[in-house]
Amino acid sequence: MKSLNLNINRRSFFKKFLYSLISLQFIYVIVRLLKPRTQILNLENYFDAGEISSFEKGKIYPFGTQKLYLHRLKDGGFLAVSSKCTHLGCTIGYNPQKKSFECPCHASAFNTNGEVMSPPATRPLDYYPIVFKDNHILIDINNPQRRSKFNQSQVKYI
């Protein structure tokens, strides 16, 4: 019976081992770059505002415990805005007669989209991302979005 004679020394072993390790890392990076990214929705950060059908078009709904207002626009879209004034952080209220949010501290006023109507506030109310799942409205209450102006991309449609 013949024995295998592997003429391998320590240096060549480590050299091959190192090349193998580098190759594996390179392959891993390439696979990660080519693999499509899927975003997993972590529902722990979301507040369930209720069923979509329970919100009438053109109405604003306060969620005091979450410190936000949910606006169902006339065109059916949803916009969740913070109830915290962007001037000094006072809690704002909604005035249905004037159709505006008003700050009791320094009289800042915001329209129903959260845009500044009267100073001293200089920027719109923060808004919260919204997702729809199983016919429910979920609001990401841990992720308020600071904005410099209102744009239609901030409104979420079914």
Region roles according to the model:
Residues 99-107, 117-126:
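Short cysteine/histidine-rich metal-coordination sites, predominantly Zn2+-binding motifs
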Residues 1-8:
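N-terminal secretory signal peptides
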Residues 6, 15-86, 90-97, 126-158:
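N-terminal pre-ligand scaffold of iron-sulfur
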